[in-house]
Structure formats: C-alpha cells, structure tokens
C-alpha cells in the first residue's frame, strides 16, 4: 500500500507539473512581462513622405492602447524607422530592428519597394513581417514567403474591379495606364488584364515611371496621344497629383481611375487641384471620414476622439490617417489573440487563422479572414468617386 500511495502522489505531482508548464508564459525577442517591442520601416522622408502619416497614426494608436493598460497587461513599444522610400535603407532598417532592437516582429511597414527589400532577410530569420502596407501578390505567397502577410487589399483585386467598372460604363473603352515600374504597378496591370479578359486589347497604351523621376508629364502626354478615353493611374501621391494636374492642364477628359494607395485628398487631390480631381474613381475598404453617412457611427466617433486626444496634428480626413489607425488595430487584435504565448511562431500561427475578425473603420461587411494557404486578409472593397469635396460610394461591396 505504501508503494501505491507513493505512486499516486507522484502521479498527481506529475499532472500538476504538466499543468504548470501549460500555463507558462512563452516569449520571443522583444517581449517581457511588461513590454512587447515591435518595429516597422516607413517613408517619413523622400518622394513618398506623405505616407509618413500612417506611421504617425500607428504610433498614436499604440499610445492610446498603452494608456488603457496595454495588451494583456503589456505596453507596446514601437520602433519606427525612416527609410525615405529607399530599398537599401529599408533593408538596413530591417537588420537593425532584428539584430539591435531585437523586436518581436515587423508590423505595418509601408511601401512595395521597402518591403520587398526586407522580405527575404526577415523570412530567412523567421521574423514576422505582417500587415504590410502593400497589395502586391508576393506579400500573399505563403509557400515562398511564409513569414510575410499583407495588411490591405490585393492590387490585383482592385484593378479586376476597375475592369468590371470600365466594361459596365464605357461603350468603347480605350485604356491608357500610368504605372510605377515595380511590383506595385505591374500587379495592377495584371489585375486589369485579368479583369478585362477577352477585352484586354482595350488597353491601348502603358507608360511607366520610376520613383526617382522628377515628373510624369511626358508619360501623360503619351497616353493622351494614344486616343485613350480611360486612364488608370497607379502611382504614389506625388506622381498621382502630377498626373491628374497634367491631364487637366492639357484639356484631356478621360475617365480617371486611381489606385487606392495614391487616393488621398490631402496628399494627391489637393495638390492636383480639387476641380481637376472631380470624377476620379478609386477603390476603398475603410469608412470615409467626413461622409455624413458615418456622422453618428460609433467607430467614427471613436476615431475622432482618438484624433483629438492622441493625434491632433494629423488630418482626420486623410485616409492615410485611417490606414495607420486600422492597421495598428489589426496588430493589437493579433497580439491579444496570442495571450501569454508571444513567440514569433505563435504570432504567425494566430495571424494565419483569422476568421471574421472585425476591425474598427473597415466598411460594414468587411472582416479579416486568413488561413495558412490564404494570406489575403482583406478581400472586399467598394468603389467611390470624388465629387470635388469628398468621396461618394458607388454601388455595393464587391469581392470576397
């Protein structure tokens, strides 16, 4: 009987140890009982400096979360570095964030060239590169880059929707395309061709530019001379503004479609001229600030309270502010799901198992959904048209 009693005690003790181990906290780099350190790379300077608004909005959102107790009792520390929209600088930033700052992961970095420059290094080191501000396909390719996931709408999906809109509204479309000469521009071209299908010959002229170019005036003149009556502008705000202004100045009046990364009123349409921008059509997946339809919406009211308390220097009517806000909210939602298992492996596992996750400021009906084989978290959008003062939604939610 003595041996049996000893065995039972040992068995109970063993189960207690298993339970204790199951409850143990698991931390990756940058995590303690009181802190979660994360990083990103943002173009606060250079040709895409207007995108710096997203980084400032993210930082402000994390301050708000920290003031409310943080995530599961831990405060978020964001190390946000300027890359000037330069791929070599972005690659340097990634190494610093991982090797010197020892962050848990890279969240909400902006720009296709910068994220491409960081991608292989981060995947080789098995560091999460999540909720990237870019819709290119290579950030939605789990087989090749399992540690990278986009955080907004796929560019191919946007221009497939544009193609359907063109075919529905233009009797005999002749399409000219201005695009940035990288994956950002080329993915949009791919989506346009796929969406047009048998009508792909309607693309009569394409013209590319480099982010280091001074202007895109000559490209716009080329497109106008092609006889195009539709123009798709796939450009960052600086060059999108130049394109819209030049179209207006030469008296050209095509249907103007603008890829959503450049569709910001303060960064693109105001510099181009609001009158020149009337009629511009883009895709959207977040609520439009200033739209009376959302005046009493709880999420919109919370957003404006956030601006007042934590980001008074940011323009609430700039969708880049909204982008930074919703992206940081995605990160916080993900970290909450991780509980006390804040390893890089679990962060990735949680990110690839999102189902109908609601995030503030996304349009009604749009939720986050991912699987280990599907890294496109946002799959739906709604088209909208600029009326001279703000955006007016067109039709209903599309995609899925």
Question: What are these regions, as identified by a protein language model?
Answer:
Residues 26-59, 81-88, 110-111, 178-186, ...:
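Extracytoplasmic "Venus flytrap"
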Residues 83, 130-131, 137-140, 211-212, ...:
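Venus flytrap/periplasmic-binding-protein-like
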